From Swiss-Prot:
Source organism: Escherichia coli (strain ATCC 8739 / DSM 1576 / NBRC 3972 / NCIMB 8545 / WDCM 00012 / Crooks)
PROSITE patterns according to UniProt: LIPASE_GDXG_HIS, LIPASE_GDXG_SER
Annotated family: Belongs to the 'GDXG' lipolytic enzyme family.
Domain of life: Bacteria
Protein name from the UniProt record: Acetyl esterase
GO CC term, one of those recorded: cytoplasm
Transmembrane intervals: none
InterPro entries attached to this UniProt entry: AB_hydrolase_3, AB_hydrolase_fold, Acetyl_esterase, GDXG_lipolytic_enzyme, Lipase_GDXG_HIS_AS, Lipase_GDXG_put_SER_AS
Amino acid sequence: MKPENKSPVLDLISAGMKTVVNTLQPDLPPWPATGTIAEQRQYYTLERRFWNAGAPEMATRAYMVPTKYGQVETRLFCPQPDSPATLFYLHGGGFILGNLDTHDRIMRVLASYSQCTVIGIDYTLSPEARFPQAIEEIVAACCYFHQQAEDYQINMSRIGFAGDSAGAMLALASALWLRDKQIDCGKIAGVLLWYGLYGLRDSVTRRLLGGVWDGLTQQDLQMYEEAYLSNDADRESPYYCLFNNDLTREVPPCFIAGAEFDPLLDDSRLLYQTLAAHQQPCEFKLYPGTLHAFLHYSRMMKTADEALRDGAQFFTAQL
């Protein structure tokens, strides 16, 4: 679609979202659009520091977890000693960016609202790691903490997965992987999915929306996919195109959050409609006036805080 035909998104977003978009960080250099992935990762980490400030304080612990690919860093957020469940968080960033620091506030707020232990998994990024390595690392971390739950003093009898954007895909893919391969890591009580991509290759929202403001043009999405997948056949894998998996049975309860002006919104809508059509427990909530990645901005934006609270409440209601 010609760029001129796209929706005038920046004119339509909410006042709170406009405040975020217009918030300048004077000490921050321009985004290195033509830089290396390493430079873009460094910039992303620096840019997120401002938005992570003032997060809830709580006990945190860091552990390296063994996987067949090597050690993977994890970070535990413990809001109380007697947690009712453990929630594994997978950060977004198009599979190529992000880490435990860039999503620190999101995990802390989620832990605070749910009063559950939250474990962030710093899966290996692409293109260094190709599908399905990230999923296998996540599953390995779940198995490790399930086996060592007593030593780490965490409750692994009930677990959940949560993620934003690419992390939402990884969250649901990991839950389906455990189901399909009959791996016991505790009862999966729920999956929390904020503005994820789940396998659509084209849609109305992908055509109408997306631009330099969110890094989700058709070209951007293609670049993320090419970095993540090992080959063309992976596009149809039931752990990448999740609509090719069996969504008619034993899908854990899903909280599906959509951003109104997100090119990936139709992915969330289709996931919800598919699950609902087959009586799988799910809830869909649309957050008006928001852009993709709005969850990061709870320091300034009430809607972001609300979306985290909604997800936490959905999860605790399943326990």
